[in-house]
Amino acid sequence: SMQYILLDSWEAGMQNWTDKMIDEFTIRRGYDPSPYLPCLAGRVIGNSDISDRFLWDFRRTLADMFAENHYKAITEYLHDQGIKTYSEASGVSLEILEDVLLCKKYVDIPMGEFWRGIMHPDLMYYQDVRGAASASHIYGKNIVATESFTGGGFDSPQALKETGDYWFTQGVNRIIFHTSAHQPLDTKPGNTMVGTHINRNITSAEQAAPFMNYLSRHSYMLQQGLFVADLVYLLNEGAPSTVPIWGSGLSPAPPEGYDYDYINADALLDRVSVAGSKL
């Protein structure tokens, strides 16, 4: 029977309104947003400080709603059916005002993605994977999955191993191939589409067992034990609250030899304790 549903990266464009938006905002922020809605069209209500405060509240409300009314709601519904969730919640496209770690909190297995080819190890995919690993660590989950080897084409197991090894060092411990098409036809190359092709029609298929066993054993070993970060980077409390996918990355950069996780305000308030002078 079906055990998991996978929610891919959000690629549905920006969503910033719903029929219950006024009610949702009022409950979450404690005041009626109606007088301030012209701020969404660039108007100033009261003064710039008041308008900016409303916009902060509005964006934060959207982030909370994406996490709770989408990812949490889907996960709870599927749990009632005996099904768990994987999700990139919400992915590298950054199409929504999200709290990326909060979105990943509400799925069973948080995911990132990495590509094979010219985008390895492009900053946005590097940060996306580190975000998935951070969500798993700070919210007490032991699996960090990735949409793996996207892009590419007909790469050899040797080339895929090099890429996979790098991402194992960044926190990945479960590989989900992009793409392995379920197809009855033996015509070659078959249904290929985008992604590295992992199916019985590729030339290395009959010799694939050692590589698959290699990935499986690494994944299993990396799922054991407990990650210990030297540093945590607190993400923006407002929205969007996401890992630094664009730009030059972490600032300040961690000292050489030190590892880190990201943390959001939710985890800082609810999952962090202080013993002596240490978090």
Name each region found by the language model.
Residues 3-4, 9-279:
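Carbohydrate-binding surfaces of carbohydrate-active enzymes
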